[in-house]
């Protein structure tokens, strides 16, 4: 079973979301998602300053197996991207919840967080797949 940190929120599309001390949210893909995709070869990052809506595809993770869209779990403004992925996309595989984060977003509507899954619900989703 994949590692599913309890403090994170999850989307049904296998993105995770972590609230930071400054009020922004860090987004990445789950350990389960990176296991399905396999070894990352490239991550197409969103533009800092771009405004996205929840569910918008805003990044792409390319692996040896496939290219997969990464969706914004909440609406808001992209405030940072993980430039380390340009040289080291494999961080998404080795550290999906730490060094392999993809972007940070300033949420424009925090009520959207209510539609995300907690760790227990995400684990149940994986068991149903």
UniProtKB/Swiss-Prot annotation:
- Which is a Gene Ontology cellular component entry for this protein? cytosol
Cofactor details (free text)? Binds 1 lipoyl cofactor covalently.
Q: Which NCBIfam families match?
A: gcvH, PRK01202.1
Q: Which residues form a coiled coil?
A: none
**Organism of origin:** Escherichia coli O6:H1 (strain CFT073 / ATCC 700928 / UPEC)
* Record carries keyword Coiled coil: no
Instruction: Name the protein family.
Output: Belongs to the GcvH family.
Q: Where is the Lipoyl-binding domain?
A: 24-106
The record, for Pfam families, names:
GCV_H (PF01597)
Name the encoding gene, please.
gcvH
Q: Which GO terms describe its biological process?
A: glycine decarboxylation via glycine cleavage system
Signal peptide from the UniProt entry: none
The molecule here is called Glycine cleavage system H protein
SUPFAM superfamilies linked to this entry: Single hybrid motif (SSF51230)
Q: What is the lineage of its organism?
A: Bacteria, Pseudomonadati, Pseudomonadota, Gammaproteobacteria, Enterobacterales
Q: Which cysteines are joined by disulfide bonds?
A: none
Assembly and partners are described as: The glycine cleavage system is composed of four proteins: P, T, L and H.
Q: Which UniProt keywords apply?
A: Lipoyl
Co-factor requirement: (R)-lipoate
Q: Which residues carry this modification: N6-lipoyllysine?
A: 65
**What this chain does, per the record?**
The glycine cleavage system catalyzes the degradation of glycine. The H protein shuttles the methylamine group of glycine from the P protein to the T protein.
């Amino acid at each position: 079973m994949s590692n599913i940190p309890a403090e994170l929120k999850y989307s049904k599309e296998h993105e995770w979301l972590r609230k930071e001390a400054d009020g922004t949210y860090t987004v990445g893909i789950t350990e389960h998602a990176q296991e399905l995709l396999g070894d990352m070869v490239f991550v197409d990052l969103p533009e800092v300053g771009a405004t996205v809506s929840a569910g918008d595809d805003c990044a792409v993770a390319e692996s040896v197996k496939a290219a997969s869209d990464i969706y914004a779990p909440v609406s808001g403004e992209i405030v940072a991207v993980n430039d380390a992925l340009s040289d080291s996309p494999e961080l998404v595989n080795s550290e999906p919840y730490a060094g392999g984060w993809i972007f940070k977003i300033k949420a424009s509507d925090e009520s959207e967080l209510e539609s995300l899954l907690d760790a227990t619900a995400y684990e149940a989703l994986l068991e149903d797949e």
